[in-house]
Curated annotation (Swiss-Prot):
The name this protein goes by in its record: Lysine--tRNA ligase
Binding site for Mg(2+) 2: 437
Gene coding for it: lysS
HAMAP family: Lys_tRNA_synth_class2
GO molecular function terms attached to this record: ATP binding; lysine-tRNA ligase activity; magnesium ion binding; tRNA binding
Signal peptide: none
Family: Belongs to the class-II aminoacyl-tRNA synthetase family.
Length: 525
């Protein structure tokens, strides 16, 4: 439906006529306020277990009086009574309109239409109502409000999706998330959980002594990851700038400045593909702590995730999943998690001991056992061949939480080499579960001369391949390292993917209010 198409729909026209009729009665269908309300959740918490009395007690005003607002999502008329369900945030409550008791705010006493007929004929599903009335329990034990006064707070001009069919079209669900939220209890719960997860992360990080900061989204030089940036122009300075692809570099500069534990939760932008686990705009947490290495960071990460799982799951560390291609799975997030080097994981889960194979043999294995195009690894160095084998043969099998450690040096220039002296591998780990990468972490490189050398090597590769994702050298960052950055460990977690894991979501689009979508033809006109 185009932006204007709904204006000619029969339902819209009928509701618009009702809107005019309501206005003609002297009722403002869009009032300015409705103060003094309680939430449905608060009312249920306070009164659901009390003895309140029946509808007769409510009619005699002997039960507690309450005031709520919300969207009418169900309505049925039964003789002199009418029943409705009011949705407020993620909670619903039944209300009862009575022919002899209920009134309509603003309806003139001499109006030709009675209050109950106004409620039945002029109100529609989707309207937002203010309700004042008295609580009681029905014969079936349902907490209900006997309505004394109903106030129309907003006349909805477009009908709700069918109550039983809901929104089956995923395209519409993602584009018109407001309809999805109104229609689905499950969707609302997912986004309430998302909000709570972010709040819990902050609580955990603050309790661990980390300070939250904010750093620029617009940057003169992008860095901290291998990704293609969004490019824009800062008109005031007549300069090209980039939307950040990572939070890392700015946070390390703050570490140099003397803040020993620092974190940021913020938006990151990568001008790359869209799939089940990737969106060009996403939310990350990155954190850096002085005087720790990647072993300590593994403990931080697994304890953080265990804390979140327990907080959302009544103290249990076990979650059950239904959307995995391997079928239903039960996963325990209790720390400590499995720790395994990348090479060992390829041997264990991919049945390939990379130490026994030359580079050309690794290429043959990739050709025989994966669907990767040959040009993607034909000239790749050994470290990237090992990484490709891991990605193709191992990732999907990491259902239980794993920390995969000791990655090839070709995967990042920002990490310290193994302290064992093997310069081909670095103290990096990635955390996986449900076949998804959850976390990326390093023992951070703080030797400025070694850092410059590694970044210059990347620049040489970029000169040979202009389409590569290697970023330009940030001289300010190198200057900051020369000032002295303490030994540190750092991690980054994609919060959207974390929410997927904690809510059993099948796609990243299910945990983003408004995911990136292709522009509609009507939007191009």
């Amino acid at each position: 439906m185009s932006e204007a198409e709904y204006l000619t729909q029969e339902d819209f026209l009928q509701r618009s006529n009702k809107l005019q009729e309501i206005s003609d009665l002297g009722i403002n269908p869009y009032p300015y306020e409705f103060p003094g309300t309680s939430s449905v959740e608060e009312i249920k918490q306070e009164y659901a277990s009390q003895t309140l009395g029946n509808s007769e007690d409510a009619t005699n005003k002997k039960t507690p009086k309450v005031k709520i607002s919300g969207r009418m999502v169900l309505f049925r008329s039964m003789g002199k009574n009418a029943f409705a369900q009011i949705l407020d945030n993620d909670q619903k409550i039944q209300v009862m309109f009575n022919r002899d008791f209920s009134s309509v705010a603003g309806l003139p006493e001499d109006a030709e239409i009675s209050p109950i007929k106004f409620i039945e004929k002029k109100l529609d599903l989707g309207d937002i109502l203010g309700i004042e009335g008295y609580l009681f329990f029905t014969h079936s034990g349902e907490l209900t409000i006997l309505v004394e006064t109903v106030t129309l707070l907003c006349k909805a001009l477009i009908s709700l999706p069918d109550k039983h069919a809901g929104l089956s079209d995923k395209e519409i669900r993602y584009r018109k998330r407001w309809l999805d939220l109104i229609s689905s209890d499950e969707v609302r719960q997912t986004f309430f959980k998302r909000s709570r997860i972010i709040k819990l992360i902050r609580q955990y990080m603050d309790a661990q002594g980390f300070m939250e900061v904010e750093t620029p989204i617009l940057q003169n030089i992008y860095g901290g990851a291998e990704a293609t940036p969004f490019v824009t122009t800062l008109n005031a300075l007549h300069s090209e700038v980039f939307l950040r692809i990572s939070l890392e570099i700015a946070l390390k500069k703050i570490l140099v400045g003397g803040t020993s534990r620092v974190y940021e939760i913020g938006k990151v932008f990568r001008n790359e593909g869209i799939d089940r686990t990737h969106n060009p705009e996403f939310t990350m947490i990155e954190a850096y702590a002085a005087n720790v290495d990647y072993h300590s960071v593994m403990t931080y990460v697994e304890n953080l995730v265990e804390y979140l799982v327990c907080a959302l799951n009544d103290g249990s560390t076990v979650l059950t999943y239904s959307h995995l291609k391997q079928g239903p799975q039960t996963v325990d997030f209790k720390a400590p998690w499995i720790r395994m080097t990348m090479k060992d994981s390829i041997k264990t889960y991919g049945d390939v001991d990379v130490d026994l194979h030359a580079d050309h043999e690794l290429r043959n294995i990739l050709k025989e056992r994966t669907s990767l195009p040959e040009e993607s690894y034909a000239t790749a160095p050994r470290g990237l061949l090992i990484t490709a084998l891991f990605d193709e043969l191992v990732c999907d099998k990491l259902i239980a939480p794993h920390h995969i450690t000791d990655h090839p040096i070709e995967t990042t220039p920002l990490c310290k080499s193994l302290r064992s002296g093997d310069a081909d591998f670095v103290e990096r780990f990635e955390s996986f579960c449900l076949g998804k990468e959850l976390c990326n972490a390093y023992s951070e490189l703080n030797d400025p001369l070694h850092q410059r050398m590694l970044l210059e090597k990347q620049m040489e590769k970029k000169a040979l391949d202009p389409d590569s994702e290697y970023h330009p050298i940030d001289e300010e960052f190198l200057e900051a390292l020369c000032q002295g950055m303490p030994p540190a460990g750092g991690f980054g977690i994609g919060i959207d993917r974390l929410v997927m894991i904690l809510t059993d979501a099948a796609s990243i689009r299910d945990v983003l209010y408004f995911p990136a979508m292709r522009r509609l033809e009507s939007e191009n006109n």
